[in-house]
Structures are given as C-alpha cells and as structure tokens.
Regions:
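Intrinsically disordered, low-complexity polar/charged tails and linkers
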Residues: 1-184, 190-233
C-alpha cells in the first residue's frame, strides 16, 4: 500500500506542475514521474531475514519479492531471493542509482560482502504539456494518412491517442507516446534522458500543429483572407 501511495505522490507532483503550465497555456519542459531499473546481487538473498532486519514487507502467499522503501527518497525496491532487484519510483536517473546504492547498504547488513551488479535502466516515464488542447481526431486522421499504422485512438475505450515516436521519424528512439486532448503528453519506454528529450523536442512541434486554439485561429485568418478577396479589400 505504501508503494502505491508513493507512486501516486510522484504522479501528483508532476500533475501539479503540468496544471500550472496548462493554466498559463504555456508549453512545458518534460518532467520525469518514474524511473525503473533492474540489477542483480552476486549471491542469493535471504529475504525473510532481510525483511526482519531492515523492516521491509513480505507476503510470500501473494508475491515472491520483499518490498522496501529506500532511504529518504520516494523510490521503492523489490528484492527477490534469487538476488534480482527492481527499483521504481525515482524521479531522476541520479536518484535511481542512489536508491540502488542505498539498497545495497541494507543488504550488506545480512550479507556484508555482497555486490550489486548489472544495474540497467529499463524504463523512464515522463510527461509534458504541449501548450493547449489537442484535436486528437485531426491528429489521428493525419497519422493514418501518413501511414502510421501503429497509432491507436478509441475514445470510447480510452481517452488518449497512442503511437510510437519512431513511426514519425526513424531517427527517434523506440519509445511510446500517449497524447491527451487536454494537452498532456506521456512518453514512456526510454532508457536515457537524452532519448526522452530528443523525442519531446521532435513531437512537440508535430503536436503543436493540432492545438485546437491554433487551428481555430488559423481557420479564422483564412476565412478573413477569403472575405477580403471577395470584397476586394
């Protein structure tokens, strides 16, 4: 339960930041809401003893891993008896690696010589605000015309439009994008911050073309020009 509350807190922090940009109708930078990494200890772990010593949570009838809050950060860790660990909830790569180091300190209390190996970032989840509300129907129609077949939009089932960044530009990372009509955008699947930033730098320009306010203004200008031509003014 505490891990869920923590993740909700991280998401809440990002949502409040996006809400501030949305109120000003101002495009935001990209904010990280969750980083996930896996790693291995170089020995099997007595997770029952670890939970007893370090005040973790373990219920083997429902889940095979012990759960720990790591240090003072918002990160959480799962420790399996095989030695595998999963860290989640960090809001930066630096915090993620710090969480793994802090977890090793806990494990060293019962396994003094254990070392953490093969730390690998598996997923970075981030969000941003494009600067206005998005016409998802127009965006979806445009993606279909461009032959982007992996785009998915079924508003009766889910309010977001999904597509892969790589389908827009082959040079982009293999990450997934989720756009909502209020203007919020979620980028997931990145392994580095440069992948996230590269994706946002590209797609924000594409999505900006479908901001409702911009399209209304554009249509108004075209209508005015047409009227001027017809009246000869």
């Amino acid at each position: 339960m505490s891990r869920k509350r923590n993740q909700s807190s991280c998401e809440g922090d990002v949502k409040s930041k996006l809400a501030a940009y949305r109120e000003r109708k101002e495009q935001s930078p990209v904010f990280v809401s969750n980083c996930v990494a896996t790693a291995w200890f170089d020995t099997e772990i007595d997770i029952k003893k670890l939970v007893w010593t370090c005040y973790g949570e373990l219920d083997p009838t429902t889940f095979a891993a012990a759960k720990f809050r790591v240090g003072k950060s918002k990160a959480r860790a799962l420790v399996f008896s095989s030695g595998k660990i999963v860290c989640t909830g960090a809001t930066s790569i630096a915090d993620l690696f710090l969480s793994v180091q802090q977890l090793q300190i806990l494990v060293n209390k019962i396994h003094p010589k254990v070392q953490c190996l093969n730390i690998c970032v598996q997923n970075i989840v981030s969000s941003a605000y494009v600067g206005g509300t998005i016409d998802l129907l127009e965006l979806y129609a445009c993606l279909m015309k461009r032959g982007i077949c992996d785009a998915s939009y079924s508003p009766e089932l889910f309010p977001g439009l999904r597509f892969s960044a790589k389908s827009l530009n082959a040079e982009l990372p293999n990450v997934k994008v989720l756009a909502f009509s209020i203007g919020n955008v979620v980028i997931t699947g990145g392994k580095t911050m440069s992948e996230i930033q590269q994706t946002w730098d590209f797609i924000k320009n594409t999505l900006s073309q479908f901001i409702t306010e911009n399209r209304i203004e554009h249509r108004t200008i075209l209508k005015k020009l047409k009227q001027d031509r017809e009246t000869g003014t």
